[in-house]
A protein has these predicted regions:
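Helix-loop boundary and gating motifs at the non-cytosolic
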Residues: 1-36, 129
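A membrane-interface helix-boundary motif in multi-pass transporters
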Residues: 25-31, 134-155
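Loop-to-transmembrane helix entry/capping segments in MFS-fold secondary transporters
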Residues: 26-27, 110-120
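Helix-to-loop junctions at the C-terminal end of transmembrane segments
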Residues: 42-56, 139-140
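Structural signature of the two symmetry-related core transmembrane helices
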Residues: 58-73, 152-153
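Multi-pass alpha-helical transporter architecture, strongest
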Residues: 73-75, 149-172
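Helix-loop junctions at membrane interfaces in 12-TM secondary transporters
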Residues: 73-86
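Intracellular juxtamembrane helix-capping segments at the cytosolic ends
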Residues: 95-108
Length: 172
């Protein structure tokens, strides 16, 4: 949950560099941000239905694949058509947060729930604070594409390991 949260937060910070790369008029930034954030909100409304349809195992895979895939796809589509990738990413951002918090709620005793969710948010911010300067440096020294691809790897490796461990735990 923390890795996915950090991944979606990091992508939120990539939106402006992507818009700058595309030479988007600044007057459109607010419009695009608003539509992206509304996309998250509407997706969150459907998250329970989506989770019930796919179930926790498939949903975990889908979230990881679409989040990592969003970084990779955007890296290779830094065009205005690539903005559609951002919208798909933001749909999964809208699914991921309530679904993953729901899983935490199911696994946590009520007297510890607020603490666990606070620690989750702290981990997200801590991970972002740890990787953001490096990702920014990659963007400045190499390219936006490299920064996006390295971000995908930073998410995929621990995300895949932790998802695999979770599946293994649930099978035993």
């Amino acid at each position: 949950s923390g890795i996915i949260g950090a991944a979606t937060l990091t992508m939120a910070w990539f939106v402006q560099p992507v818009l700058m790369y595309l030479k988007t008029p600044v007057s459109w930034y607010g419009v695009i941000w608003t539509v992206l954030n509304l996309t998250v909100g509407f997706a969150a409304l459907w998250s329970d239905r989506v989770d019930n349809y796919f179930g926790p195992r498939k949903m975990g895979i889908l979230i990881l694949v679409f989040i990592v895939g969003g970084y990779i796809s955007l890296a290779f589509n830094l065009t205005y058509a690539g903005l559609a990738i951002l919208f798909v990413f933001y749909i999964f951002r809208g699914f991921a947060t309530p679904i993953l918090k729901g899983y935490i709620n199911q696994m946590t005793f009520s007297d510890m729930r607020a603490t666990v969710l606070s620690i989750r948010n702290f981990i997200i911010r801590l991970m972002f604070a740890a990787i953001a300067p490096f990702i920014g440096w990659l963007n400045d020294m190499y390219s936006l594409q490299i920064a996006l691809l390295v971000s995908a790897g930073i998410i995929l490796i621990p995300g895949g390991i932790l998802l695999g461990l979770q599946f293994r735990k649930n099978n035993h």
